[in-house]
Amino acid sequence: MADPKYADLPGIARNEPDVYETSDLPEDDQAEFDAEELTSTSVEHIIVNPNAAYDKFKDKRVGTKGLDFSDRIGKTKRTGYESGEYEMLGEGLGVKETPQQKYQRLLHEVQELTTEVEKIKTTVKESATEEKLTPVVLAKQLAALKQQLVASHLEKLLGPDAAINLTDPDGALAKRLLLQLEATKNSKGTGSGGKTTSGTPPDSSLVTYELHSRPEQDKFSQAAKVAELEKRLTELEATVRCDQDAQNPLSAGLQGACLMDTVELLQAKVGALDLAVLDQVEARLQSVLGKVNEIAKHKASVEDADTQSKVHQLYETIQRWSPIAASLPELVQRLVTIKQLHEQAMQFGQLLTHLDTTQQMIACSLKDNATLLTQVQTTMCENLSTIEGNFANIDERMKKLGK
């Protein structure tokens, strides 16, 4: 109970809950504070987009199969991450590529594009009527690009004044090497004819060559030549081949045939147009025409007989249908009446079924009630016998108490 000295003080709210006010913020808002922004120029601010970073590295894994980063005590070298022949710069680094890195990147991309084109050529059937960039045209352009890259590489090896034939860079390189070897042999022969001292320095005009084999270039050139040959054969077949026309007997059998089959068919048809053969063909055609006329006459007579038989059958059917058509309205009326009778019979059958079901339910209920009544009677008899025994005991006790 509160102290009575505070009962009559002014400003006290009576019959209301106690409220304790404070100037502090709620607990949920106390943790909120503004982070101090770093304005120093020594701190690099990097804006990271988590969604873009996740999409970039999604489904990417570092292959650790066969790698060993443990410390080594023996002389055997552990296998770590191996790098390729060169390293391509990443995107957005702001570092300018050197000519060597740019050449290596272009060569790598051309090789990847060549592999993809080879896969496309095996799966996609080229069309002679398409005007878009087909795999064959793309292979030609790739061959030209690869030859340009090879040419630039050879110029770097042999010097800026090297005259390289872009159509055959490998042959031009071989010829130039042979010329240089011949010049070296000649200079060597002239030097050995005179007397040389032991202090004479070696000839500085000698050239050291490094031979680089490029089997992928030969394979690519061969594939490009085969693709060009296939394209020319396809264009030639499309030019010689004609469309299938049912009305033109000369074009029969030419659709879908290759160039050799088409030429053989055309030679056979041209041979059939010889004068000696035409007389025989005309005689055969006359005999065939006579047989065709006989067949047409016989067919007309057969068709007339067939038509007459069908007309007779139709007339007999109409004769049989006439008496049935007269009695048809009465039959329809009778069917309508029988339909109503069938509907009433169906309703009556449903009522009988419902009545039978209700009767069975009542019989079951009566049977259950009879069973319950028997149980009640048995229970009442037992209770009456028990009550009579209790009253007898009470009478005996009363008599004993009265004595």
Curated annotation (Swiss-Prot):
Keywords for the protein's UniProt record, in alphabetical order:
Acetylation, Coiled coil, Cytoplasm, Cytoskeleton, Dynein, Membrane, Microtubule, Phosphoprotein
Record region (Disordered): 1-26, 184-204
As recorded in UniProt, coiled-coil segments are: 100-130, 216-248
Record PTM Phosphoserine, positions in chain: S83, S322
What is the membrane topology here? Peripheral membrane protein
The UniProt entry, under InterPro entries, shows:
Dynamitin
Subcellular location, record wording: Cytoplasm, Cytoskeleton, Microtubule organizing center, Centrosome; Membrane; Cytoplasm, Cytoskeleton
Residues with PTM N-acetylalanine = A2
Q: Which residues cross the membrane?
A: none
- Its domain of life? Eukaryota
| Subunit record text | Subunit of dynactin, a multiprotein complex part of a tripartite complex with dynein and a adapter, such as BICDL1, BICD2 or HOOK3. The dynactin complex is built around ACTR1A/ACTB filament and consists of an actin-related filament composed of a shoulder domain, a pointed end and a barbed end. Its length is defined by its flexible shoulder domain. The soulder is composed of 2 DCTN1 subunits, 4 DCTN2 and 2 DCTN3. The 4 DCNT2 (via N-terminus) bind the ACTR1A filament and act as molecular rulers to determine the length.
Question: What does this protein's UniProt record list under function?
Answer: Part of the dynactin complex that activates the molecular motor dynein for ultra-processive transport along microtubules. In the dynactin soulder domain, binds the ACTR1A filament and acts as a molecular ruler to determine the length. Modulates cytoplasmic dynein binding to an organelle, and plays a role in prometaphase chromosome alignment and spindle organization during mitosis. Involved in anchoring microtubules to centrosomes. May play a role in synapse formation during brain development.
Q: What is this protein called?
A: Dynactin subunit 2
Organism listed in the record? Bos taurus
Gene it is expressed from: DCTN2
